[in-house]
Amino acid sequence: MNASTPLLLAALGILVAERSGVLNLGVEGIMLMAAIAGYMATVETGSFAVGFIAAVAVGILFALFFAIFAVGLRANQQASGLGVAIFGGGLSAYIGIPYQGAVLPERAADGIPFLDQIPFLGQAFFSQHWIVYLSLLMIPAVWYFLFRTRPGLVVRAVGESPFSANALGYSVPMIRCATLAFSGACIGLSGAYLSLIYTPLWVEGMIAGRGWIALALVTFGTWRPFRVFLGAYLFGGMTMLQMNLQSIGISVPTQFISMAPYAATIIVLALISRNPTWIRLN
């Protein structure tokens, strides 16, 4: 669950933005900036809450920075996203130099009181950080918003036919900026979780390609929240399996684990493209 949570959070944010017709390839850079922002804020203030708020704010800020070019100026989305990824990676490395080796304050024990004492199940399911449970609650929430509410219908309409949505009086740029802001908040929370809870430390490039994996997961899950959840936990489970195998002396090449999400995405796209029913459903 720990390894899957950052992937799931980022992927759900990306999914909503892509449903509105925006592809943000800057996820890796935004996650890095959010990770260092959360780490800096926590070290300086001694409060994890302030750290998470700072990370979410930076995630939204960088997502809207991308929106200026991709939505406002109608620049090429792929080029703009790659620019944000490179910029975020370089800037985070520079401003994070003084914080390498910095010590975080002690935090309260994770888990749900009493339930985390249940044998086996308690440690597996009820001893996690609250962000893990938040990410799980977001799955049905995002699904309900997109497929059972009028604003969600508008978001999907903007993504599928922006000219028709504009003709009906909806502001396509505003809706896309709103979905990007939500996406930035999710990506920011994901980055903060990595630097404050999962690791917890700051190292240059610590996101280690998770932003790209989250992008691949959205395609792997065919833009459906529950399928994205399955993909995130599948690849998160593979990461933990690799660590457990290494701990008992079985060596698994890290390159294999790294390439698995992309290979699986290519296979899924190939299968969908060969089946007219799947194309219609997705």
Give the positions of each predicted feature.
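Transmembrane helix-bundle core of multi-pass membrane transporters
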Residues: G89-R148, I248-I257, L281
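Transmembrane alpha-helical segments in multi-pass inner-membrane proteins
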Residues: Y198-Y262
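Helix-loop-helix "hairpin" substructures at the membrane interface of multi-pass membrane proteins
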Residues: A124-W202, P225-L230
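Hydrophobic core segments of alpha-helical transmembrane domains in multi-pass membrane transport
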Residues: A10-A11, A35-Y39, G89-A93, L134-Y144, ...
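Alpha-helical transmembrane segments within multi-pass membrane transporters and channels
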Residues: G46-L91, T239
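Hydrophobic alpha-helical transmembrane segments
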Residues: G29, M33, A49-A57, Q78-L82, ...
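Membrane-interfacial amphipathic/re-entrant helices at transmembrane-helix boundaries
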Residues: M1-A10, L23, A37, E44-G51
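Cytosolic-side transmembrane-helix boundaries in multi-pass membrane proteins
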Residues: A141-V142, E160-M174, N244-N282
